């Protein structure tokens, strides 16, 4: 550990007033210790010390707190697709668990929760919905949950319909306009068109939803199929076509430029 820490310390010391690594690795905060070992030190998944830290992070701290509030059926606060109430229900609990580094291998309750969520929110067409129908899908939810479920270690075969819909919804391949009500695969009032078009954004491309979709597509394991690669290329072109610092992306009238 000390040699690896030394390798990290040199570039950090030029930017910071002190070395944060020893503080991040303190055993009193197992969650922060685990994430620092994984993301800052870059220890491989098979590293014994990292494995022990991950186990401790699941037994104590925020991961354990979130899991202790889960209903035995696999949901938080109320049954169903779990979008509300913000920010305590199933959607937000799963996102938080993913951000904290939780994994299905470490606690059977995580597998229970991801299975329950997919049973209630993933539709046959691959849409991840806030309601019981495909009209409840939107890029920010789709991207957030595909990312979270992938990070948590959810079975990729189970997620494949969501991956395909996510990629197609960006490129528009094989998806009919919302007006074609009888089409087997179409856009809807909220998810209304390709390149992150969103009904809540006056049907214009939404960079906030787009970032979440790109985040999800970027971490898919293995070699991406051509459809996913095309979606990533199209999404990157949209997000990088202007200066990201001032923004300038389409947004609803009356909404703040920075959010």
Where are these regions (language model features)?
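Preference for long, amphipathic alpha-helical scaffolds in soluble/luminal domains
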Residues: 1-259
């Amino acid at each position: 550990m000390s040699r690896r820490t030394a390798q990290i310390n040199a570039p950090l010391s030029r930017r910071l007033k002190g070395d944060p690594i020893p503080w991040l690795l303190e055993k009193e905060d197992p969650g922060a210790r685990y994430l620092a070992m994984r993301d800052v030190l870059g220890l491989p998944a098979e590293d014994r010390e990292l494995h022990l830290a991950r186990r401790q992070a699941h037994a104590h701290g925020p991961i354990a707190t979130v899991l202790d509030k889960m209903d035995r059926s696999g949901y938080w606060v109320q049954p169903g697709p779990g979008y509300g109430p913000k920010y305590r229900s199933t959607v937000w609990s799963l996102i938080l668990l993913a951000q904290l580094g939780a994994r299905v291998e470490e606690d059977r309750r995580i597998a229970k929760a991801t299975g329950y969520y997919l049973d209630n929110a993933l539709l046959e067409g691959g849409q991840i919905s806030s309601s019981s129908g495909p009209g409840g899908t939107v890029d920010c939810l789709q991207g957030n949950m595909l990312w979270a479920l992938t990070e948590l270690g959810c079975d990729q075969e189970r997620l494949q319909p969501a991956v395909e819909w996510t990629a197609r919804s960006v490129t528009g391949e094989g998806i009919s306009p919302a007006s074609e009500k009888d089409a087997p695969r179409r856009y809807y009032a909220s998810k209304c068109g390709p390149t992150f078009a969103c009904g809540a954004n006056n049907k214009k491309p939404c960079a906030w939803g787009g970032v979440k979709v790109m985040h999800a597509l970027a971490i898919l394991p293995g070699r991406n199929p051509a459809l996913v690669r095309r979606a990533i290329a199209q999404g990157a072109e949209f997000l990088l076509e202007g200066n990201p610092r001032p923004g300038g992306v389409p947004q609803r009238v009356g909404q703040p430029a920075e959010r």
